[in-house]
Amino acid sequence: MSRAAPRRASQSQSTRPARGLRRPPGAQEVGQRKRPGKTQKARQAQEATKSRPATRSDVAPAGRSTRARRTRQVVDVGTRGASFVFRHRTGNAVILVLMLVAATQLFFLQVSHAAGLRAQAAGQLKVTDVQPAARGSIVDRNNDRLAFTIEARALTFQPKRIRRQLEEARKKTSAAPDPQQRLRDIAQEVAGKLNNKPDAAAVLKKLQSDETFVYLARAVDPAVASAICAKYPEVGAERQDLRQYPGGSLAANVVGGIDWDGHGLLGLEDSLDAVLAGTDGSVTYDRGSDGVVIPGSYRNRHKAVHGSTVVLTLDNDIQFYVQQQVQQAKNLSGAHNVSAVVLDAKTGEVLAMANDNTFDPSQDIGRQGDKQLGNPAVSSPFEPGSVNKIVAASAVIEHGLSSPDEVLQVPGSIQMGGVTVHDAWEHGVMPYTTTGVFGKSSNVGTLMLSQRVGPERYYDMLRKFGLGQRTGVGLPGESAGLVPPIDQWSGSTFANLPIGQGLSMTLLQMTGMYQAIANDGVRVPPRIIKATVAPDGSRTEEPRPDDIRVVSAQTAQTVRQMLRAVVQRDPMGYQQGTGPTAGVPGYQMAGKTGTAQQINPGCGCYFDDVYWITFAGIATADNPRYVIGIMLDNPARNSDGAPGHSAAPLFHNIAGWLMQRENVPLSPDPGPPLVLQAT
């Protein structure tokens, strides 16, 4: 038995610990880590595992079951630990990335883009209202209005947005109006309130368009616009002041017109836009998200400065009559164009400046392409013909090279500068006086006298008369015309200039030449702006241009008397001038006819049958008050429709009417008969 006991003991050592003092339940050796107890869920799982029938994989070989189980537990614990560490690190990385993104965005918001965002935020609150300045008026010398402004509205609409809103409202409730019917109702309302201008069809077409913004109508009375918008809130109203031209086409070539946004487009409306338009005012304030103005936020108040009134030298009555006469002359003569200018003989002020076929600025200018939109009197130079002979007449008298009664033996042609120049009619040698040379408008006699003057003095006289240079009248688009510099003259140049060929001038320049003779030899450059009147009523007169002495007073008086010969009548014809139809009974009238061949652009040569027909005259020769210049572009007949090619009848009509209008007394002395041809 003593041998058997030790053997059992050795066998038991392999399966349980050696005998010794038993530890109480829950006791732990010093230095030994306490293993965490299993949770209830873990114990339940373990019991469930034990209760399951053993499978092949659960059955471990004898002696290895405990070690394998422990090995699997260690592996499972390691795997679960590695997975936890991975998830933990991944989560930290994601959080770090999000923090970096947030920090970057915060940097951009608070540092990099801070100023712009602050401005944008302020802009969403800030509102600036513009207070339009009233455009100044344009009036004549008597303060009769040619152009003025009244307050008006433009009806606006946003087709795409409004239609979308109407369709969405219709989808939500059947009580909402049918979108297409609503548009038709709006079109009918607008057309009805505006007297069918535009008509309903035109309005509906705009309402149904694919545009984002359209104007339904312009120049609408504010009360009418308010009524339409109140009934149909979909329609907006925008302030667009209406420019009124009470005379229609009266002086439209001078006054001009404006475009749809109220700025100058043509004429003085364009060139004086800064003076007439004024400066808009404005006020800035803040508005909350509900659209209500934030109290106390008003700032940056700038009061509107209204435009100034421009006072012209024109006389509406004279302008109206001359414009009528010009249109009538065009119709009767068959001319392509007709223009006329009336100047005050003493001051050079423009009293009338008229063209035919003038546009109406109160209507849509864009639809008046067949009308005369420009101002040919200042912008379209032409060769004047014999009207230019006043230069030779003035020079020869001023330099004492001839006298009015000197008799010249004038042949039918003359050789000069390598060219042969003829008179307009065939004749042999004629005993014309110097007065008769100009009264009969002899080209040959004029060149004979011009040879006495010489090129240098003749050129100097051209410049004194203001040719080849702008007048500075104050109108846009003015042409200087053309006078060849003397150093570019060829041999034939001096054979052409004295008879009005080879140079060009505007109608205003031509009329200004005769103003110098009417004003005792002093040329006052013409002007059309008399004064400006500020909104506060203060008036600023336009400075009078400097006077230019052209010839002496005595020379001017002599030339005026010589030019009476042009309108002189003689039943026999010997002492009759070229423009007797210009005369006005009871008054001494003086003037000069002109005919000039037009240039054929195809060959650079002159047409044989296309002419400029001109006339310039003084009313009256003994007491000058008015200077009148007229131009007809290639007429088929006289300005009164009679056979011939003369503008003298138009001068007669205008001058005679002026004498009656102003109650000018008859000339006390009709003047002695002038000798044109010696007998």
Swiss-Prot record:
Effect ascribed to mutating A103L: No effect on degradation by Rip1
Topology of this chain in the membrane: Single-pass membrane protein
Gene Ontology molecular function terms on file: penicillin binding
Key words of the record: Cell membrane, Cell shape, Cell wall biogenesis/degradation, Membrane, Peptidoglycan synthesis, Transmembrane, Transmembrane helix
Origin superkingdom: Bacteria
One Pfam family recorded for the sequence: PBP_dimer
InterPro entries: Bact_Transpept/Beta-Lactamase, Beta-lactam/transpept-like, PBP_dimer, PBP_dimer_sf, PCN-bd_Tpept
Segments in the Extracellular topological domain: 112-679
Keyword Cell membrane found: yes
Function: Synthesis of cross-linked peptidoglycan from the lipid intermediates.
Database matches in PANTHER family: PEPTIDOGLYCAN D,D-TRANSPEPTIDASE, PEPTIDOGLYCAN D,D-TRANSPEPTIDASE FTSI
Record-stated family: Belongs to the transpeptidase family.
Protein name, as recorded: Penicillin-binding protein PbpB
Taxonomic path: Bacteria, Bacillati, Actinomycetota, Actinomycetes, Mycobacteriales
